[in-house]
């Protein structure tokens, strides 16, 4: 399997525009399309089809697809044999090539929103992990966290930190560390929700 670069992780190939032309040379409309052009188009559409097949069921339902293509993708998800899956993906590729440019662009736009949401969730989890690591490493971080999240149960937080440190020292399973992660997650979620709840009143003030 090819290693995925940082750039390709953030901007997957299936989100790149699929440029399809009926001719090979703009200066000579009679020139047939080259093999390399056809290969690029086929590969781009295959990547798009593979990305669709890999979507969770709830997300796939949100993508604007012709019924025949949606049915083919659902069938591909049910196939377990390698050869059967390969043939089904070839069929999906054929259906993808029958789509209009507008159809493809609409699909790409929805997939781009999924990628954006996944990146935001990943960033949120990293923020939680960073807070947990800081809390375990530095008592000063506890004071900073409480100041940033005043609704935090201070005693419970300090107990979790103390127990997690002790577990690490004794080589025990990180039960308290996992509980600390959840506590930080809830605190950050509460902070975000408080910000959202404050927005309507700000809008009302602006409109007054």
Curated annotation (Swiss-Prot):
It comes from the Bacteria. GO terms for biological process: assembly of large subunit precursor of preribosome. It holds the Pfam family DarP. Keywords: Cytoplasm, Ribosome biogenesis, RNA-binding, rRNA-binding. HAMAP family: DarP (MF_00765). Residues 1-41, 167-208 are annotated as: Disordered. This is Dual-action ribosomal maturation protein DarP. One of its GO terms (cellular component) is cytosol. One of its GO terms (molecular function) is rRNA binding. It comes from Ralstonia nicotianae (strain ATCC BAA-1114 / GMI1000). NCBIfam families: PRK05255.1-1. Member of a network of 50S ribosomal subunit biogenesis factors which assembles along the 30S-50S interface, preventing incorrect 23S rRNA structures from forming. Promotes peptidyl transferase center (PTC) maturation. Residues 195-208 have a biased composition (Acidic residues). Its main location: cytoplasm. Belongs to the DarP family. It is found in: Cytoplasm. InterPro entries: DarP, DarP_sf. The gene is darP. The keyword RNA-binding applies.
């Amino acid at each position: 399997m090819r290693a995925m670069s940082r750039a390709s992780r953030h901007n997957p190939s299936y989100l790149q525009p699929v440029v399809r032309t009926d001719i090979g040379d703009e200066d000579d409309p009679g020139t047939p399309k080259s093999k390399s052009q056809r290969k690029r188009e086929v590969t781009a559409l295959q990547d798009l089809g593979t990305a669709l097949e890999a979507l969770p069921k709830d997300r796939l339902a949100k993508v604007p697809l012709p019924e025949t293509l949606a049915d083919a993708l659902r069938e591909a998800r049910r196939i377990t044999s390698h050869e059967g899956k390969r043939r089904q993906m070839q069929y999906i590729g054929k259906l993808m090539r029958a789509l209009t440019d507008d159809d493809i662009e609409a699909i790409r736009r929805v997939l781009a929103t999924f990628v954006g949401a996944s990146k935001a969730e990943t960033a949120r989890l990293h923020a939680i992990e960073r807070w947990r690591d800081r809390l375990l490493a530095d008592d000063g971080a506890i004071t900073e966290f409480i100041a940033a999240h005043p609704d935090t149960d201070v005693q419970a937080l300090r107990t979790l930190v103390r127990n997690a440190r002790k577990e690490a020292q004794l080589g025990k399973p990180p039960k308290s560390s996992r509980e600390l992660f959840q506590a930080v997650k809830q605190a950050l979620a509460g902070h975000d929700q408080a910000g959202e709840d404050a927005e309507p009143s700000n809008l009302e003030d602006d409109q007054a």
